[in-house]
Amino acid sequence: MFGECHAHVIMDGKNYKAAVALHKERPNEAVIREHLSAWQQADITFVRDGGDAYGVSERARELAGEYGIDYRTPIFAIHKRGHYGGIVGLPYDDRQGYRELVQEARKRGADFIKIMISGIM
């Protein structure tokens, strides 16, 4: 058994902009299934996704059971507007905005809350 502990199903590791464009209108189920199938073939049974702003990781979690994968996601990361995190999350401006995003994540069934507090290391 193997696990992927820092995935972003919305990304492809080649071209971020092209990968995200595949999901702009709605999560692209065919692309998501390609990722899930590749993980299944690699005997990966646990995936911890970092979330995204388009609902892609949320849909992946819904489909993952078909592939024998335990899929966890925050649905989206939470970041302060104008700071690092826009590629995988939603912004807040003040404490009330932050509270609303946490409530939204809970409502959508987030497995954990991801808070962006630093940039790329």
Where are these regions (language model features)?
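Metal-associated gating/positioning segment near the N- to mid-region
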Residues: 2-62, 84
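Metal-coordinating catalytic core of metallo-dependent amide/deamination hydrolases
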Residues: 65-121
